[in-house]
Structures are given as C-alpha cells and as structure tokens.
Amino acid sequence: MAPCKPRTFTAGQDPLTKFDGAISVRNLPRPPDRLFLFHGIMRPSRGIYAKLIATGQKPPTHFHPSQWEFFRVLRGNLTIDFNGRAIHRTASDGELAVPPYTHHVIYGTPGTEMNEVEFVVSASDPAAEEQGATVMDQPFFENWYGYQEDVFQRGEKLDFIQVLSMFDAGGTYLSPPWWVPFRSWVGLFLGIVVGRWIGGLLGYAPFYPEWTTDWEAACETMQQSWFQRRFADPQAQERAREKFRGQLEQEASAKGGKSE
C-alpha cells in the first residue's frame, strides 16, 4: 500500500470529463443556500460504468453526516439506492433530497444502460462554516474522479486508506454492509481514524495539486488537521504544473487545432 501518485494534471478543467467520457461534470452558478451546483452527464455504456454493469457492481455506498444532497434528473433514467431501497428517477420526478446519514449511491437505471443520464446535483450543510468541518465539494469530486481514473484505466492499485482519506476530507464516509452494527459509527471511525489520522501519518493526502482547481482552499482544509497540514504546500501546484508541462501543452495545441 502507498499513497497515490497522480498520472495526469486536470486542475482547472471545466467541464471535468473522466473514464473515456463516461462522466462529465461542470460548475453552474450556485443558489445562495447551496454549497455547489454541478451539471452532470453520465454515460453508463462507457468506461468505468460499463465495467461495473458487466460485473453487476455499483459505485460505493456512502453517507454524509451533516450534508443534505439534492438530485434532479434532466434527461434519462437515474437510480438512487436510498437506505437499501432503489428509487428510480426521471425528469418528471423533480428534485430528490437525501438527508444526512442516509446510506446512498447513484447509478444509471438498470435496463437503460445505453441512455445518457443528464442531472444536476447540489448540497447544503449547516455545519459548513464550523471550524474543522469537512464538506463534499468540488475538490472532493476532482480528486475522487482523478484517483478512480488512475486506478481503473492506468493501472494504479486501489488503496483503501487513500479512499478513506479522500472521502473523509469531502465530508463523505463509506457505508459498511447493512448487517454491521452501528454501521454509521463504524464508517465514521474508519474515515477519521484510519483515513485522516493514520493515513496522514503514513503520507496519504486527501487532495493532490494535479487534480485540484482551488488548491488554496484545499490547503486551508488540510491545515485544519494536525495529521494533514504537512501536505498544505501552496507552491505544490506550480511544481506539478511544471512536471506535466508537456501534457498541458499537447492538450492546449489539440484544443487550438479544433477551434480553427
């Protein structure tokens, strides 16, 4: 086991497209009562989602101890496992609110795998202004998607401590199986003790400059934990940008060619 070493530089990309186009997320102007508002397009027939469907798997079930999460389908079919109950949503169903401590996961509705799913997701959190509070936000999504892409498409080995570290910093915790007693408390223990404390001591950062657009905000979050403040290096992103200069110049050239 070892902390991840990002293989791409995607900080600043908007929309952020991952897994050969299987998921694309872009920022929208957020309402005053929401921490973020993302517009997402999920293509279940591509990339990681196609692999999960082929093996009958789903993304990891998780929960948020203080955040409310909101989903609204604009096009296609989306399923949300809501405390073990599958809820199927379409554009006619309006917004679905997911309260704190709800064990949930979203995926394309089975039987409609070839459809694109267009949706918006947002969140609110009364504890967001509290000192030391962690929240699910853009840096979390950028790092989680970046890490998954390296694992599933570039041969990076999946590391449980790395996952726990990223989830904890995003105010998100993996849900143990339903039969585990006090499953939410077990999830919190794993995220905080193993992900944040032990992971920090072992060199696992929750955010990486190669993937994080607002690196300054990520550094501020890591500064709040004694176990993670050593990763809060304001100059790290410039060094990472220099390391990946060849990739960035190639991408800029490709974009310029398309616009001509």
UniProtKB/Swiss-Prot annotation:
Note: The macrophorins cluster contains a single gene insertion (encoding for the terpene cyclase macJ) compared with the yanuthone cluster that produces the linear compound yanuthone.
Entry protein name: Oxidoreductase macE
Molecular-function GO term, any one: oxidoreductase activity
Role played: Oxidoreductase; part of the gene cluster that mediates the biosynthesis of macrophorins, isoprenoid epoxycyclohexenones containing cyclized drimane moieties. The first step of the pathway is the synthesis of 6-methylsalicylic acid (6-MSA) by the polyketide synthase macA. 6-MSA is then converted to m-cresol by the decarboxylase macB. The cytochrome P450 monooxygenase macC then catalyzes the oxidation of m-cresol to toluquinol.
Keywords: Oxidoreductase
GO biological processes: terpenoid biosynthetic process
Keyword Oxidoreductase on entry: yes
Enzyme Commission number, as recorded: 1.-.-.-
Biological or metabolic pathway of the protein: Secondary metabolite biosynthesis; terpenoid biosynthesis
Family: Belongs to the oxidoreductase OpS7 family.
Class of the enzyme per the UniProt entry, highest EC level: oxidoreductase
Keyword tRNA-binding: no
InterPro entries named in the record: RmlC-like_jellyroll, RmlC_Cupin_sf
Gene: macE
